[in-house]
């Protein structure tokens, strides 16, 4: 192998690198990662090069614990991603999923490097890019894509504390969510309308705070989730029924409609025990695990934490999934935010939900974990959560 390595392309070098790393030969593996990254760069495969430079930087940071060791590789990755962003936004049809990934990687790197100046600079630039995209989609009456773009613009303006801009975007989102909700109601899509009302409530909170405007809209979301559950039940879809009911439970909880939330939660728990048993009897353990997580969410919503953690632990024994971990942390944070009327926690919940909606579960998990750690009132439930996950402090 040593005699032919110079003839190998970056793909082969990358495969060999990870083989070395998996064998415990970290130093040799990282040298090959660097060579593979340079090879991809020479072939103008910027995305692959950026990915490997980022990986190299994070491994060096983890092993050495020194930012300076990781800085060259991470900066190389960041600027390659910036090149990719510039290329993407000049295309006739922008791939917003690819753009999301590139922008997230750049900001993650500058956040890791504690480079506040570049973090704010590029967050501001990305916000403007997404705002322009949102306007373009809106002009073409593509409301779902306009919403996606404006949501990203809102998040990036929040990073820069540009109050005027993020309030402006929030106002635009209120209009678009309202339009989306109306369209879905006209089509008889209760769940789609409920999701739009839920997100509309979040934008209202950005302007008015945790007040009656937010509460009324969140209550409307709850009613539509409840209506969607009845439609699903009439169609014999019990899985969709309970999914909508758990969403209704938490919408009512955030709307401070505690009695309705509790009643739905208790009834949903009963249904879920039967559904889980049915999935298990058919040998569908994966679906049973998903419903066990839903059961845990419903139990957290009615403050039955010990039972919730037992259900969650059972789910993880069947299937360990990052999305499960995010869902449980969100349930804990929502329950706490509702019980305390804590707008700061709700702000963090919305950030976590944003990244979860992008399927960036690592970032969502990190944000949710940080929020849990900050609150001493959550120490007991946090310890129970870690125990269920097999993490001992």
Model-derived features with residue positions:
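Residue-level recognition of tetratricopeptide repeat
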Residues: 18, 38, 51, 58, ...
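Structural motif corresponding to the intra-repeat A-B loop/turn of tetratricopeptide repeats
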Residues: 23, 43, 63-64, 113, ...
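Alpha-helical segment of the N-proximal tetratricopeptide repeat
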Residues: 5-42, 134-140, 145, 181-186, ...
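Hydrophobic/aromatic packing residues within the alpha-helices of TPR/SEL1-like helical repeat arrays
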Residues: 33, 40, 53, 74, ...
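TPR-adjacent "capping" and linker segments in tetratricopeptide-repeat scaffold/adaptor proteins
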Residues: 1-12, 23-24, 117-126, 167-173, ...
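Alpha-helical repeat scaffolds
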Residues: 70, 126, 133, 275, ...
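TPR-repeat structural position
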Residues: 26, 46, 67, 96, ...
